[in-house]
Amino acid sequence: MSTDTSQVKVKFFTREKDESLHVDDVPMYAPISLKRYGLSEIVNHLLESETPIPFDFLIDGELLRTSLQEYLTKKGLSSETTLTVEYTRAVLPPSFLANFNNDDWVSALDVSDDFRHIYSGSYDGVVRTWNMSGKVEKQYSGHTGAVKAVKYISNTRIVSAGNDRSLRLWKTKNDDGSVSNNTGDENDEENIEDGKTLAILEGHKAPVVSLDVASNSRILSASYDNTVALWSTIYKEMTAIDHLEEIQNPNNKISTAAKKRRKLTLKDGTIRRRAPLSLLESHTGPVEQVIFDHGDNTVGYSVSQDHTIKTWDLVTARCIDTKTTSYPLLSIAQMPTLNLLACGSSVRHITLHDPRVSSSAKITQKQLVGHKNFVVGLDTCSENEYLLCSASHDGTVKVWDVRSTSPMYTITRQDPTVEKGVNDKVFAVKWAKSIGIISGGQDKKIQINKGDNIFKN
């Protein structure tokens, strides 16, 4: 039988809320040679659309990336099968919007809750606040090494961390110039200038490379000293450290390198210092990233070069689950409505894991393949539960629908001076509603890409 004339019975349906996009629930025959574009033509014909709408198609929850014939063959199904095919508005390619020029490599990114500001951390040790015109509104200087993580806390506070082994709480200001908020530290902040350090948080013994902030005033940090630490955004809740006494005590036996670091920070001797609320120890290798559980801020997840994903009870400071993989893990993001943790690895792929599954059961639910180097950053789309973006040392950001194992789109660096494999590594990515996909890296650029319909289901 010729593949040009072979047909299969299909029944189309959609979960789109817009009733005008619904078709009658009636089976019909379609050529098995059709792919997404041909199926989209059929649905648009049924809808009698004046302007064609691009659609994606799913069968049994899996995105169709081949012809119907290839799908039937792969699944071992005959053309006598009736296929129930779901259609949904297609995610359109994200287009290049802007580049903001930074002084050094961009290693960390976050955005304000109102999406009016971008916060960046850089290898020059400076944290910056950017407006959406690409202007630096504020610089926060104090770190003595590269800034590897930055997080927005409130309109008067951010936190950063880096290679100098410390975290810093910074004072910012409201748009109206006021500086008060409900942090519990207001009375002590009156004499501290905007852009200055409120407190230095110490306790890690190696670079601090990841931060996350929860709504209950808690901070998590991940370090290359193999530990995760829990802190508060309210410095009064943490134990004070007498930094100057520690430095000046002649009985302290410290290395020459440590003495040098402490000499560099003597200028910050008047800044309050705080110890962590708890130190979480279980990893046997550098911890690359840590996050709070989206629905329960007493639970955290971390990934490490020791090949493991760990689940933490932050109330008792205990590791309550360990999932062991076959490769170093470098990044993690939660997809809460799907009950999945996405993890980027040193072997170039992204794996999806269900944190509820026992560590003795099958660990990996799905593997996303497409990158050609380390996957060092992940973020999810707040408006579409299936979408994920990833940053890699291969010089790209990829957009994924996790119902498929292949990337939907690839975003490359747009600076013409970038040389592939020389200065194109991407270190950080943030997917922000109303802004787009923000990425930064070795090209010293904060790049913004945005696509129509990219946030819609």
Swiss-Prot record:
The answer to whether UniProt assigns keyword Nucleus to this entry is: yes
Gene3D superfamilies reported for this sequence: YVTN repeat-like/Quinoprotein amine dehydrogenase
- Which parts of the sequence are annotated with region: Ubiquitin-like (UBL) domain? 8-89
Q: Where in the cell is it found?
A: Nucleus, Nucleolus; Nucleus, Nucleoplasm
A Gene Ontology cellular-component term: preribosome, large subunit precursor
SUPFAM superfamilies in the record, alphabetically? WD40 repeat-like
**Region named Sufficient for interaction with ERB1 and association with 66S pre-ribosomes:** 99-457
Instruction: Spell out the residue ranges that the record assigns to WD repeats.
Output: 101-140, 142-180, 203-241, 282-322, 324-363, 370-410, 421-457
Cross-referenced SMART domains, in alphabetical order?
Answer: WD40
Q: Which GO terms describe its molecular function?
A: ribonucleoprotein complex binding
Q: Where is this region: Disordered?
A: 172-191
What is the species of this protein?
A: Candida glabrata (strain ATCC 2001 / BCRC 20586 / JCM 3761 / NBRC 0622 / NRRL Y-65 / CBS 138)
Question: What do we know about how this protein assembles, alone or with others?
Answer: Component of the NOP7 complex, composed of ERB1, NOP7 and YTM1. The complex is held together by ERB1, which interacts with NOP7 via its N-terminal domain and with YTM1 via a high-affinity interaction between the seven-bladed beta-propeller domains of the 2 proteins. The NOP7 complex associates with the 66S pre-ribosome. Interacts (via UBL domain) with MDN1 (via VWFA/MIDAS domain).
The name on file for this protein is Ribosome biogenesis protein YTM1
Give the CDD domains listed for this entry: WD40
